[in-house]
Amino acid sequence: MLELTSEFKPSPDQQEAIKGIVKSIKKGNKYQTLLGVTGSGKTFTMANVIKELNIPTLIMSHNKSLCAQLYSEFKGFFSKNHVEYFISYYDYYQPEAYIPRTDVFIEKDSSTNEDLERLRLSATASLLSYEDVVCIASVSANYGLGNPNEYIGMVLIFELGMQISQKELLKKLVDMGYKRNDNFFDRADFRVQGDIIDIYPAYYEDEVVRLEFFGDELDAMYHYNVLENKKGKDLKRFILYPTSQFSVGETRLKQAIKDIKAELNERLAYFEHENKLVEYQRLKQRVEFDLEMLTSTGMCKGVENYARHLTGLKEGDTPYTLFDYFAIKDRKFLVIVDESHVSLPQFRGMFAGDRSRKQTLVDYGFRLPSALDNRPLMFDEFIHKNCQFLFVSATPAPLELELSKENIFHQIMRPTGLLDPLIELKDSDNQVEILFDEAKKVIQRNERVLVTVLTKKLAEELTRYYLELGIKVKYMHSDIDAIERNEIIRGLRSGAFDMLIGINLLREGLDLPEVSLIAIMDADKEGFLRSTTSLIQTMGRAARNVNGKVLLFCKKITKSMQEAMDTTNERRKLQMAYNKKYNITPTSVKRHIEESLKNEEDLGEIYRKGKKLEKMPASERAKLVKELRKQMLEAAKALEFEKAAAIRDEINKLRDL
C-alpha cells in the first residue's frame, strides 16, 4: 500500500488535475499529459496520483540534478514505502571506440560510484520483492540489464531452521558474485568465523546479515551494524540477491559460453574468407580471453557486450531493461516522464549514437556482432512498452500533446497564489554592470540570484569578475558529478553563496524558493538555449518567490522572447483572477533544505579540522569510521599499504573511544 505523508492538502486546481489523471488512467488510456506551470505543485500532484492508483511507479527525468531532487522529495512523500534511485553509476565514462581513419582504438575508461551502484541494486531488489515501489530514474532505465527471471532465479532464501552445509552455502555465494574477504570486509563480500557467516549484501549501506549455525542448521539470523559493532533486528526470513543484474545460473552460463563460441567461429570464418587477418587475430584473442574469464569466474570485463547470449535473447530482440523488472509477473505499472519536452527527445536520440559507435567496433574485429544488441531501447520500443504513461511539463512538445489527445490536464494556478514573474527588458550593452546593481538589492533581502549565459568561458569570467566585486558566487557546469551538483544547489539555498551562474543546467524542475531574480544574458540570441520553451522554463525558476523577477538582456525582441512574454503575461492575468476569486494572498514557497548526499565526506572534513572526537556523537563517529574505511580500502587496492595501515590505526582509535 503506497502511503502518502504530507502536511498539505491539494489545492482546488490540483484536485481537479489529480481527479482527471486518475480517471483517465483507470479507464485504460495509455498516454496522458499534465501541463502545469512552474511552481504549481506538479510533483505533489504526481505523488497524489501515485497514491490514488496504488501501483508501482517509475519516474524518469533527463538530468541527474532533477533526479536527486525528485528522490529527496518522494522519500519524504512516501517515507513508509520503498523509494528507489536508479541513475548511471559512472562518475566518468569513456566508451570504447575505434577511429579507422587514424587507426586509433580508445579503450573503455570509467570510474564508478559505489553508492550509486548500491542504489541501483537496491532498486532491482525492491522491485522483485515488494509492490509499494516508487523508483526515480534517469535515461539509465532505457539501457540493457540482465534477464529479471534469471536474476530472481539466482536469489538465496534463508529461513531459521533451514539445513545447508557451509561448503554448499559458500559455493552459492560465490556463484552469486560474492567474494570471501575475512580482512577488508566490504559490500558484496562475506566472511567466515567458525560457525558464524557474515554477508554484506551488495545493496546494503551500513548493515550486514549475520548467520549463526549449529552444525548445518541455521540457528540465528539478524542484522549487524559493522561500524558500531551492534546487533540489529532479528530475522526469521531473508532474501539475498546477486551482486550484479547480469548474474546468471550455471545452466544459462554454459549455454551462453557455447553460443559465444559458435558466433566467434562464424565471425572468424568470415574474416578469413575476406582475408582480414588483423581483424581475425584481434577478435580471436579478445573473445577467447573473455570466454576463459566467463568459464572460470562467471564474469569478464565488458560482460554487457555478451548480454544477448547471457539473457537468451535472439538477434534484434528488445533488450531487458528496468521496465522488465517493473513488469515481472505481468504487473501493472505507471511511467511518469518529468519535463517530458526535454526527456523524450533525449530518449529518442540514444539508439542512433550508440549503434554507430558499436558498428565500427564490430566491423574491425573488436567485438562480436551480438554486441550490437547491448543497446538502449529504441524510441518506439520505449513509447510502446506495456504500461501507462503520464507526461509532465510546463511546456509539453507536440509529441506529448498528440499522443495524449484529449487527455491533457492543466494546472495553471499555484497553491501559494504566486504569479508568473514580472519581466523586465534591459540593454545588453551594460548587462554585467546592470546585473551587479540588481543582484546587490536582492542579496540584501537575503534572496538568491540565478544567471544563465551562453558559453562556459563567459560563465567563468563572470564568476571571477563578481567574486572580485565581493559577491559570493559559484558556477555550475556539465563536468560536475551528480552528488557535487546537488551540493552546489544546497549551498545556494542555504546561503553559502548568493549567486549561481550556469549555461543549460538551470532550467527544468529545479525547485529553488530562495531565488527571486533570474538574469538571462543575451536573451535575443536565437537558438536552442533561447527558444520559447527554454525561456519559459528558465523564467519559471523565479516563480517560487513572491518577489520573483526576470531580467532579459537584449538589443531586440525576438519571436521566441515575444512568445515567452505573451504566455507569461496571459498566465499572470488568469492567476490574478483566481487569487481574487478565492481571496488568496501570494506567499513564497517554503521547502526544507534536504540533507547532504555526502555526509561522510563532510564528517571527514570535521575530523581533519581537529574537532574533538570524544565530543562527537556516536552516530557521527560511526559515519566517520565508514569514510575512513572506504579510504583504507581504496589505498589497499592502489597498493599503498603504508597509507592503508595508517588509516586502519586511526579507525582503531575511533572505535576505542
UniProtKB/Swiss-Prot annotation:
UVR domain residues: 622-657
Record InterPro entries: Helicase/UvrB_N, Helicase_ATP-bd, Helicase_C-like, P-loop_NTPase, UVR_dom, UVR_dom_sf, UvrB, UvrB_inter
Cell location: Cytoplasm
Residue ranges occupied by any Helicase C-terminal domain in the UniProt entry: 431-593
GO molecular function, one term: ATP hydrolysis activity
BP term (GO), one: SOS response
Record-level GO cellular component terms: cytoplasm; excinuclease repair complex
PROSITE patterns linked to this entry: HELICASE_ATP_BIND_1, HELICASE_CTER, UVR
Tree of life domain: Bacteria
Residues bound to ATP: 36-43
Record's keyword terms, sorted: ATP-binding, Cytoplasm, DNA damage, DNA excision, DNA repair, Excision nuclease, Nucleotide-binding, SOS response
Domain named Helicase ATP-binding: residues: 23-414
Motif (Beta-hairpin) on chain: 89-112
Cross-referenced SUPFAM superfamilies: C-terminal UvrC-binding domain of UvrB (SSF46600), P-loop containing nucleoside triphosphate hydrolases (SSF52540)
Main localisation: cytoplasm
Membership in a protein family: Belongs to the UvrB family.
PANTHER family per the UniProt record, alphabetical: UVRABC SYSTEM PROTEIN B
Described purpose of this protein according to its UniProt entry: The UvrABC repair system catalyzes the recognition and processing of DNA lesions. A damage recognition complex composed of 2 UvrA and 2 UvrB subunits scans DNA for abnormalities. Upon binding of the UvrA(2)B(2) complex to a putative damaged site, the DNA wraps around one UvrB monomer. DNA wrap is dependent on ATP binding by UvrB and probably causes local melting of the DNA helix, facilitating insertion of UvrB beta-hairpin between the DNA strands. Then UvrB probes one DNA strand for the presence of a lesion.
Record note on domains: The beta-hairpin motif is involved in DNA binding.
Quaternary state and interactors: Forms a heterotetramer with UvrA during the search for lesions. Interacts with UvrC in an incision complex.
Name of the molecule in the record: UvrABC system protein B
Species classification: Bacteria, Pseudomonadati, Campylobacterota, Epsilonproteobacteria, Campylobacterales
